[in-house]
Amino acid sequence: MQPTSVGSSGGGDDGGGRGGGGGLSRSGLSRIRSAPATWLEALLEEDEEESLKPNLGLTDLLTGNSNDLPTSRGSFEFPIPVEQGLYQQGGFHRQNSTPADFLSGSDGFIQSFGIQANYDYLSGNIDVSPGSKRSREMEALFSSPEFTSQMKGEQSSGQVPTGVSSMSDMNMENLMEDSVAFRVRAKRGCATHPRSIAERVRRTRISDRIRKLQELVPNMDKQTNTADMLEEAVEYVKVLQRQIQELTEEQKRCTCIPKEEQ
């Protein structure tokens, strides 16, 4: 690979182009020649005044400071410099790029555009910090009327505000109140939901009544289900009602002689 020397005038570019053309005529293949390490620096120094003039007009157009720029699209074009020494036959155009070192040391160049050298390039609407959400929550908490009234109350009562630690504790308490507990499966008979507690109380009450019913009804099978137990209890109650009715009728038919008083 043969290095190409780039000068400040256009004659060197034309000479490099003719040399590249001769190489193409002999071999028939396009040959790309690399540039030395200092070529980019020389290129930036050469094109600093020419290639940045359209950007100056564009910046003035955006800021509203320039009134002499053309308004039609066809009357204003950005010049694209072509390096004929590098790609003569292929028809490629050279694109001027800016390295990171040039941007880091371009304070004077930025000042020429009316921008301060220590200008912050990050937008105020974009927060790249990892704790941005936490900071927004703390700012919203500090700006809330409750926090303002609390601080005023502490100052009027003579108490010393505890600062960020107290606010973080209060914020943690609010988060604990608003948070939803994890759905951990409780042990059998140890549910804490109100509906679960009510259901457990109802089942316990039914079990107690069934147990009392089993004690009242003789020869009841305790291994059967609740429906069969209730049917047996109903049959037993009917039997008791018939016995009561029979005893009442016998009592009416019975005539007892009262004992004579001595």
UniProtKB/Swiss-Prot annotation:
Tissue-specific expression: Expressed in flowers.
Pfam families, per database record: HLH
CDD domains (UniProt xref): bHLH_AtbHLH_like (cd11393)
Residue ranges that the Swiss-Prot or TrEMBL entry lists as coiled coil: none
PROSITE patterns per the UniProt record, alphabetical: BHLH
Organism ancestry: Eukaryota, Viridiplantae, Streptophyta, Embryophyta, Tracheophyta
Alphabetic keyword roster: DNA-binding, Nucleus, Transcription, Transcription regulation
The bHLH domain, residue ranges: 190-240
Gene this chain is encoded by: BHLH81
Annotated GO biological process: regulation of DNA-templated transcription; regulation of gene expression; regulation of photoperiodism, flowering
Region listing for Disordered, in residue ranges: 1-29
Superkingdom of source: Eukaryota
Name of the protein: Transcription factor bHLH81
